[in-house]
């Protein structure tokens, strides 16, 4: 299993069973798909288990990470999904890139307005509500409104009254004069209803239901009762969409175990188009930490100031106003307060995820070192020190040591070594020198000894290290070797005087830990070697000799192993190394004068 797959698997375990949106990312951290879910954990897990169609299989093959945002309802998830798709334009959201894919309810801007379901949004042509998740949902809502509010139904004004007038769903403007204030009142009530304020419409329906019951028209009463139930199911407040176009940023935060998470929702044209999440180690009170953060948010991070900044009520508005030069709002009720609550909740979820992942990681690493000790037949190796050499044909040879404590990198104990006593590319002698230097100093300074030493190499490296430890320094520390396969991947762990293979499953936590250790020490050694080469620029006596360029210099070092060996070589041996007569003479003269 690849490392990114393991990380995804760990993250899936801490995703909440709540509605929300998720963002799938590729190896370049680009959002390639945005989706919504009633239960985030179940939906996200479904991508990584079982069979899929061809398109989903391609998508899953590109996923390297994911993020999620918790919402309060499925409706909010839909609205947020649309906003995120608009922002990121993910290539796997082909059907969702345009709002035309989703239906809206529209009250037309006409003398005698109509109530329509449309997939096309045109500016200044009416009032729009939505989008709705599908046409059925929009049509059912319109059908409900048609039975309560008698807007005009015909596209063109007819010459006589139609059926809708006779069933009470039109006021008959084709024949009768209609009070335009009545239209304005109906538009207001529909606007309130579709924005979550359903008390007025429910009051109308309950009156009609009661009257129908009094008149023993139970069928009609049942119809009104069903309409009331439909409204209860439909009208979930849509906190992700605002009823105005004010540009605002909404802040929420949560604090736990010495950390603060601040969530910022960016609301533009009524839509939450983006969110920012920042983790901060607490150095002061949570209020003081927030004031510092929000002041830096608009100055150091260069975020544009919105028309309004919404913050939780417990904060000091005057202090925030002193560092943020815009209108500060602290909502106490309604949709705006709900948005603050949602930001707080997302911050809380993110903190919980952080600590859950840390706990899982700690549990995993402790199990890994326990398993490693058990398989090797030694005490649990709490402290592990690993060594690796790096050089190019013996030029600028270096070595590096990394330390893992409780299965995690302990970077303050990392060490770098320049090889001092070995000439040429001799891995065994280089390893002996570095181990000798390291543990001589450990003994002299009373530093902690490791429970296990790991060398990047096989039996020869192990024997050299054990000889130095036991016969020169009098130390008894377990020594293991890590070998790689032909693909340069961690292959097997060797241990004991005969360097026997330790039986470890490739998918075990212990093997994964060894893989991390080998990768880390190799990275550290390679980085140090690169830095050393950059400083010296591979500078040597060879650089000043006519006729010897980079290729010949590399070839000579490969053939002789060191400058010292070249100096000891005869003229004929230099010629046999492929040098022209004149260049061989130049080299011999230069080395003899060195």
UniProtKB/Swiss-Prot annotation:
Which residues belong to any copy of the GIY-YIG domain?
A: 17-94
Compartmental location = Cytoplasm
Which keywords appear in this protein's UniProt record, sorted alphabetically? Cytoplasm, DNA damage, DNA excision, DNA repair, Excision nuclease, SOS response
Give the main location.
cytoplasm
What Gene Ontology cellular component terms go with this record?
cytoplasm; excinuclease repair complex
Keyword DNA repair present in the record's keywords: the answer is yes
- Residue span, UVR domain: 199-234
Which molecular function terms from Gene Ontology are attached? Answer: DNA binding; excinuclease ABC activity
User: InterPro entries attached here?
Assistant: GIY-YIG_endonuc (IPR000305), GIY-YIG_endonuc_sf (IPR035901), GIY-YIG_UvrC_Cho (IPR047296), RuvA_2-like (IPR010994), UVR_dom (IPR001943), UVR_dom_sf (IPR036876), UvrABC_protein_C (IPR050066), UvrC (IPR004791)
GO BP annotations of the record are: nucleotide-excision repair; SOS response
Q: Name one Pfam family in it.
A: UvrC_RNaseH_dom
Q: Which Gene3D superfamilies match?
A: 5' to 3' exonuclease, C-terminal subdomain (1.10.150.20), GIY-YIG endonuclease (3.40.1440.10), UVR domain (4.10.860.10), UvrC, RNAse H endonuclease domain (3.30.420.340)
Disulphide bridges in this chain? none
Record CDD domains = GIY-YIG_UvrC_Cho (cd10434)
What family does the Swiss-Prot or TrEMBL record give for this protein? Belongs to the UvrC family.
Q: How is this protein organized at the quaternary level? A: Interacts with UvrB in an incision complex.
Q: Briefly, what is this protein's role?
A: The UvrABC repair system catalyzes the recognition and processing of DNA lesions. UvrC both incises the 5' and 3' sides of the lesion. The N-terminal half is responsible for the 3' incision and the C-terminal half is responsible for the 5' incision.
Q: Provide the protein name.
A: UvrABC system protein C
Source organism (scientific name) = Staphylococcus epidermidis (strain ATCC 12228 / FDA PCI 1200)
Instruction: Provide the taxonomic classification.
Output: Bacteria, Bacillati, Bacillota, Bacilli, Bacillales
């Amino acid at each position: 299993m690849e490392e990114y797959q393991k990380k995804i698997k760990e993250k899936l375990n801490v995703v909440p069973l709540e509605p929300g949106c998720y963002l799938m990312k590729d190896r370049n951290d680009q959002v390639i798909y945005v989706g919504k879910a009633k239960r985030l954990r179940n939906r996200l897990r479904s991508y990584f288990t079982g069979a899929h169609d061809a398109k989903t299989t391609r998508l899953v093959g590109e996923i390297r990470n994911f993020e999620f945002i918790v919402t309060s309802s499925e409706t909010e998830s839909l609205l947020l999904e649309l906003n995120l798709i608009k922002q990121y334009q993910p290539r796997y959201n082909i059907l969702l890139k345009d709002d035309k894919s989703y239906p809206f309810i529209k009250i037309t801007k006409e003398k005698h307005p109509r109530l329509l379901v449309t997939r096309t949004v045109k500016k200044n042509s009416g009032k729009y509500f939505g989008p709705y998740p599908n046409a059925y949902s929009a049509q059912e809502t319109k059908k409900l409104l048609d039975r309560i509010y008698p807007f005009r139904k015909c596209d063109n004004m007819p010459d006589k009254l139609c059926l809708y007038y006779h069933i009470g769903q039109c006021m008959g403007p084709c024949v009768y004069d209609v009070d335009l204030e009545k239209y304005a009142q109906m538009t207001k009530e529909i606007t309130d209803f579709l924005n979550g304020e359903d008390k007025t419409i429910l009051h109308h329906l309950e009156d009609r239901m009661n009257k129908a019951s009094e008149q023993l028209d139970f069928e009609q009463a049942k119809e009104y009762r069903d309409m009331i139930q439909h409204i209860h199911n439909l009208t979930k407040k849509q906190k992700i969409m605002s009823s105005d176009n004010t540009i605002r940023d909404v802040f929420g935060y949560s604090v736990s175990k010495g950390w603060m998470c601040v969530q910022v929702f960016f609301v533009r044209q009524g839509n939450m188009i983006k969110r920012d999440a920042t983790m901060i180690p607490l150095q002061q009170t949570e209020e003081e930490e927030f004031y510092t953060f929000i002041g830096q948010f608009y100055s150091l991070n260069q975020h544009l100031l919105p028309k309004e900044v919404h913050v939780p009520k417990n904060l000091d508005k005057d202090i925030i106003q002193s560092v943020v030069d815009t209108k500060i709002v602290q909502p106490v009720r309604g949709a705006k307060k709900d948005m603050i609550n949602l930001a707080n909740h997302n911050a809380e979820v993110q903190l919980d995820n952080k600590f859950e992942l840390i706990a899982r990681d700690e549990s995993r690493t402790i199990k890994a070192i326990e398993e490693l000790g058990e398989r090797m037949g030694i005490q649990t190796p709490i402290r592990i020190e690993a060594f690796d050499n790096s050089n190019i044909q013996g030029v600028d040879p270096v070595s590096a040591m990394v330390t893992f404590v409780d299965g995690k990198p302990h970077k303050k104990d990392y060490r770098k070594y320049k090889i001092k006593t070995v000439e040429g590319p001799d891995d065994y002698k280089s390893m002996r020198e570095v181990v000798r230097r390291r543990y001589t100093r450990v003994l002299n300074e009373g530093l902690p000894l490791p429970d296990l030493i790991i060398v990047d190499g096989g039996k020869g490296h192990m024997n050299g290290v054990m000889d130095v430890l036991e016969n020169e320094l009098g130390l008894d520390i377990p020594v293991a070797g890590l070998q790689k396969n032909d693909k340069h991947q961690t292959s097997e762990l060797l241990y004991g005087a005969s360097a026997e293979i330790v039986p470890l499953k490739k998918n075990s936590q212990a093997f994964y830990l060894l893989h991390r250790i080998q990768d880390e020490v190799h990275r550290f050694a390679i980085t140090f070697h690169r830095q050393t080469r950059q400083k010296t620029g591979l500078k040597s006596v060879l650089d000043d000799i006519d006729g010897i360029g980079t290729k010949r210099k590399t070839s000579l070092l490969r053939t002789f192993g060191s400058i010292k060996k070249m100096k000891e070589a005869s003229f004929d041996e230099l010629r046999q190394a492929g040098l022209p007569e004149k260049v061989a003479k130049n080299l011999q003269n230069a080395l003899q004068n060195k």
